Amino acid sequence: MLFEQIAANKRRTWFLLVAFFALLALIGAAAGYLWMNSPLGGVIIAFIIGLIYAITMIFQSTEVVMSMNGARQVSEQEAPELYHIVQDMAMVAQIPMPRVYIVEDDSPNAFATGSNPENAAVAATTGLLRLMNREELEGVIGHEVSHIRNYDIRISTIAVALASAITMISSVAGRMMWYGGGRRRNDRDDDSGLGLLMLVFSLIAIILAPLAATLVQLAISRQREFLADASSVELTRNPQGMIRALQKLDNSEPMHRHVDDASAALYISDPKKKGGLQKLFYTHPPISERVERLRKM
């Protein structure tokens, strides 16, 4: 059951990434049609923009992310239990030892960052270290180490980059349509039914693509959380420790320090504790659903 869940989550992620590239091609074709009457040219430009966005974000420094979250690097002497658990989980996962950081905050939480295992880091809040026993802490750190081993940060970064590129192209295409599109449309002989259909299709794509991209990005993030939960159990062989940790995280207060939206997606549990309609656009699946999946293992 465990390995079936891991395989299923990986398949869903790849399916969603294909959907992302299809969306990028769609918005590129729509913008290309409106700008230069060349859908193929628009697709090529869209993929170049998406590639630039992805490369730029992937190589963002780990230190920058840690600094944004107020994390400080600690040694084995400063945080021996946390350090040894990270060391043990990295050894079982067969990845290099990540750097270890602590965030001064009473709310229990943790996150990992780094585009590959060689430059990765794991951070835990002081609240997490106080609240969790060793088995629960192993579950949380196993989750974060699994994100590193599974290259989740890179996949999530690509998803964010593609969503940003789609939103940017859509925004620029919309402005071009209103401020210069009329002249372009008059320059083309688009009075035919096909031309009108293409125009309507392009407008719909420009309007709806950013929303669709956001939903796909969130779906990818949720699948990677399920995968990290299952992978943590693979490392620790202790589903109950992970379940208890998630339940404690679910009952905790929001983090006291400010966490921006991009960083919030990295944490094991929503640091802002969103409610109401905001949950529709949350990067994490409900903890109750995560616990239910772990219980089925």
From Swiss-Prot:
GO terms for molecular function: metalloendopeptidase activity; zinc ion binding. The gene is htpX. It is a multi-pass membrane protein. InterPro entries: HtpX_protease, Pept_M48_protease_HtpX, Peptidase_M48. It comes from Streptococcus gordonii (strain Challis / ATCC 35105 / BCRC 15272 / CH1 / DL1 / V288). The keyword Lipoprotein does not apply. Induction: Expression is maximal during the early to mid-log stage of growth and decreases after. Does not respond to heat shock up to 43 degrees Celsius. Part of the lemA-htpX operon. It is found in: Cell membrane. GO terms for cellular component: plasma membrane. Disruption phenotype: No effect on extracellular glucosyltransferase activity, nor on growth characteristics. Deletion does however alter cell surface appearance, making cells rougher at 41.5 degrees Celsius. They are also slightly less adhesive on hydroxyapatite. Binds 1 zinc ion per subunit. PANTHER family: PROTEASE HTPX. The active site is at E144. Zn(2+) binds at H143, H147, E225. Belongs to the peptidase M48B family. Pfam families: Peptidase_M48 (PF01435). This is Protease HtpX homolog. It comes from the Bacteria. Its cofactor is Zn(2+). The chain crosses the membrane at residues 14-34, 39-59, 158-178, 196-216. GO terms for biological process: proteolysis. Gene3D superfamilies: Metalloproteases ('zincins'), catalytic domain. CDD domains: M48B_Htpx_like. The lineage of its organism: Bacteria, Bacillati, Bacillota, Bacilli, Lactobacillales.
